[in-house]
Regions:
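ATP-dependent small-molecule kinase phosphotransfer cores
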Residues: 1-42, 46-53, 90-93
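ATP-dependent NMP and nucleoside kinases share a basic, alpha-helical "lid"
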Residues: 32-83
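Short, hydrophobic alpha-helical segments
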Residues: 34, 38, 137-145
Length: 146
């Protein structure tokens, strides 16, 4: 059976994988791939508290959250023209609401993930402004930037 490539199908597939294999299954697979490269790595789209707990247990891990005004985030996803982002603003907001809060560590809870971040970047400006925020934080961390 072929899945339709959209945010909804990806949401349900990831939730099913976490339900079947544990709340950190998806992120643990990505972590394994990152370790195989043997360099500093960035894993994006951490969405559950179970994923955060797993990564925190592995050692040198920093959680960066990037947030922006919902309208601006919507405009940006429309510009990238991804198949998974072809939604109305109302559906975008519904998806955000669905992924914002959950007591289940294997289900997206973006508000808790943002709250658990070591560093929060507000991305309401330009890329240059975001990069400047990130550079300031990276310069304070105890590992070489590659």
């Amino acid at each position: 059976m072929k899945l339709t490539l959209n945010r909804d199908s990806m949401f349900h597939l990831a939730n099913r994988l976490r339900a079947e294999h544990g709340p950190s299954y998806v992120i643990d697979q990505l972590y394994g791939k990152a370790c195989a490269v043997n360099k500093n790595s960035i894993i994006e789209s951490i969405r559950t508290t179970g994923e955060i707990a797993s990564l925190r247990g592995k050692g040198r891990f920093y959680l960066f959250a990037v947030d922006a005004d919902p309208r601006l985030r919507y405009e940006r996803i429309q510009l990238r023209k991804s198949e998974t982002d072809a939604v109305s603003f109302d559906l975008f907001l519904e998806n955000e609401k669905r992924e914002s809060v959950s007591a289940d560590p294997g289900v997206p809870n973006l508000r808790a993930c943002i709250g658990a971040a070591d560093f929060l970047f507000v991305n309401n400006g330009s890329k240059t402004e975001l990069y400047q925020q990130v550079d300031v934080i990276l310069s304070t961390l105890d590992f070489p930037v590659q």
